[in-house]
A protein has these predicted regions:
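The feature captures the beta-strand-to-loop junction immediately N-terminal to the Walker
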Residues: 38-40
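Helix-to-loop junction immediately C-terminal to a conserved catalytic motif
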Residues: 53
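Conserved ABC transporter NBD signature motif
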Residues: 61-77
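Conserved ABC ATPase "signature" region
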Residues: 99, 113-133
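Conserved ABC ATPase signature
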Residues: 137-141, 145
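Catalytic Walker B motif of ABC-type/P-loop ATPase nucleotide-binding domains
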Residues: 162-166, 171
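ABC ATPase nucleotide-binding domains
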Residues: 226-256
């Protein structure tokens, strides 16, 4: 029996101010997938995540998350936005930052956290190996520790799906290596979708890959094909696989 997809998108179109951002997107993400969506800056990757989250509505097409509409399933989705969107100088503890991941579930004008919420936050911090930093100010953490705190914030609600937007941008190589170790551990219990503009993403850490630049170019494996990358990046490439995929860009024709 074929597994029901965790994420199912059919013929999705989205435009902004008359400009088509996403064109005819079809996507199936299955349980346990670690799905990487590559593409250039401005190719629609963040927009696609926002559609999956139910933050914006498509012009046409259907989106189903775990069989329901995105807004009905939002509590089952963890979201890690780009790190630069966070103000790490804000005077808040690591635990308080993680607790903020539960704000969407609170009702009323005054939102308070219970002892049970604190237990959830500490569990998420322990999962990321930074429980000992719970009372530290977020501004005092290293870049890698801040990244772990942001991921813990996405995990505090015990999601079934984890979405990550450019998780390795602006981080150093050791932090990037730590991130992929974390990703491997999380993939044992949830479905993961990660978008990035970095074609050098470590393909050995994902199960499937697609390329997005307004249109989505997919291949039902983690193999990057020449057609996929040419379609997304609009640039001829050779793919050479020796354990880890590598790319060689042919010279661009001279500009007139």
């Amino acid at each position: 029996m074929t597994e029901a997809p965790v994420i199912k998108i059919e013929d999705l179109w989205f435009s902004r101010n008359g400009e088509v951002i996403l064109e005819g997107i079809n996507l199936r993400v299955l349980p346990g997938d670690v799905f990487a969506i590559l593409g250039p800056n401005g190719g629609g990757k963040t927009t696609l995540l926002k559609v999956i989250l139910g933050l914006i509505s498509p012009d046409r097409g259907t989106v189903r998350i775990l069989g329901g509409l995105p807004r009905e399933r939002r509590h089952l989705i963890g979201y890690v936005p780009q790190l630069h969107t966070f103000d790490f100088h804000y005077p808040i503890s690591v635990r308080e930052m993680v607790l903020s991941g539960l704000l969407g579930r609170k009702t009323g004008m005054i939102k308070t956290f219970s002892a049970a919420d604190t237990v959830l936050a500490d569990k998420a911090l322990a999962t990321l190996g930074i429980a000992h930093l719970a009372d530290r100010a977020i501004r005092d953490l290293s870049g890698g520790e801040q990244q772990r705190a942001v991921i813990a914030r996405a995990l505090v609600g015990d999601p079934k799906v984890l979405l990550l937007d450019e998780p390795t941008v602006f981080v150093d190589t050791p932090t990037e290596t730590q991130f992929y170790d974390i990703l491997g551990n999380l993939a044992r219990t949830m479905t993961i979708v990660m978008v990035t503009h970095d074609i050098g993403v470590i393909i050995s850490h994902v199960t499937k890959v697609a390329c997005l630049n307004r249109r989505l170019f997919t291949h039902d494996s983690r193999e990057l094909t020449e057609d996929m990358i040419q379609g997304a990046y609009k640039c001829p490439v050779d793919i050479i696989a020796h354990g880890h995929p590598h790319r060689v860009l042919r010279p661009h024709p001279p500009e007139e």
